[in-house]
């Protein structure tokens, strides 16, 4: 048996995807993970020219295809596409103006929103809940309507350098350097919130040791090669014609 490290050939784990296809698959995989609050939620994906790809308003995350993805500028003007930008897009616009973030994900996932409502960062009880790394904070400065730029500015400022924010009485905001990392972090924070709730309901447990939390916390979300790809392939099996829609 060879002891050499396996290195997948290009395309072995996932076909080459366009940026628009990446946005669609991120939305669909996360919808299946509980990021499914009806029309809520927005994803922005910064492109090399500084514009942002974004999911369209009026279509749910499990519904829109590559042809529906819109391109906007950092002021929210639609540059390409037939749909308007989501109502809450100011949060993303202020974030991208303030920080060099590639991907930002906002939604009201089933379990993370509970902890956001309680204004508590949940304990991390297992390794899967820590995958993707990053710092998690509670932000309670997002106190205006979703389309209010001043409320968005306050939230981004309060977030500081954190990678994941539980927006008090609202939902989550996840930042990452790639689609893969955004998927990993989004899945992990929702799993962390679910497992913490169930563990505490069952009588409590012992969180991960500090050394383990520190180790996982240093991850940029890129280390678990294959995780994102496997979940994306599952979506392509469910909708084999998806890539033909580009």
What are these regions (language model features)?
Residues 2-246:
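Glycine-rich flexible loops
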